[in-house]
């Protein structure tokens, strides 16, 4: 029995002292993963917004979808932060009967407020809604 106990203690000691190997994923395996929207029919939805020194706010919104889509609707609004909440200053809609759409507008804004762009894009196949997405941009002081 003493012999078994000695063998057991010796085995445990070897396990504790022996170096263990651990492997991690290489950095290139981790960085290859991209975080992005999980769209099925929409392939690209881009938005840009800027305010010039004279107060001219301008935005561009575009949406591209797969070839089975035959209607694209884009809604966009310039919002102003006033009295603790965001309020639409003006809104626009673009409807195209193809698999891509584009909307750009200009609008003069009043100084002394924050402004941002909020937009939505929806794609249809034979007038049946297939997918939609939305965007809320960063706020800009003017």
Label each residue range with its predicted role.
Residues 23-142:
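Mature extracytoplasmic or otherwise solvent-exposed domains
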